[in-house]
């Protein structure tokens, strides 16, 4: 059920980083209907309606686990963080990775596992929702391209999200699904992080839908959020504009994972 949003304040700081520009040389994706799932270092293409999946690449980044992936609507590439190298990478349609930037631990922490793009081409990544970083990936060759232009911390209301997704029609937010309820107890909470306010809100709460967390989420620009459960592979569909979630399909069981898709493909 939809309840009144709960808000808290967040702290922010701004930083600048000098990073070499890296021009795309590998083929982009095509804004197709699929979700893209990264698990450790392997990339999969997932049919969210049927749960069927196939491997795109088995080794995306050398000697790293990739997480916090997002789909850039401006250039149709996937981007993510290669841990523990703290590299921002661009991933082609063939699963080939190119390093765009390398961050220090002081800039981004030890690792990251949530990530997605806003509509303007900024990449937002962090760890569990308690930290956030905004990277400029709008225009290759610009002075700030590939750099962290803002960062900060946020109170995730005693919960945590394992992935987040931007759905333009639903406003300036990143959306995620948390296990548990604000204040304690068992259940599932639909949450959103304000890109303008830098605050978390608990938007709706539901019973326990599946055991464990939802490590990969995907969006459609009609208000639909697909969340893949790690433990059993169930893919649940949430309407962030209101309504009850439903089981959409059964996909792969997964861990050390993250998801992304072209939110502008309406999955006809």
PLM region spans:
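A short beta-strand motif characteristic of beta-propeller blades
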Residues: 52-60, 97-105, 144-155, 199-208, ...
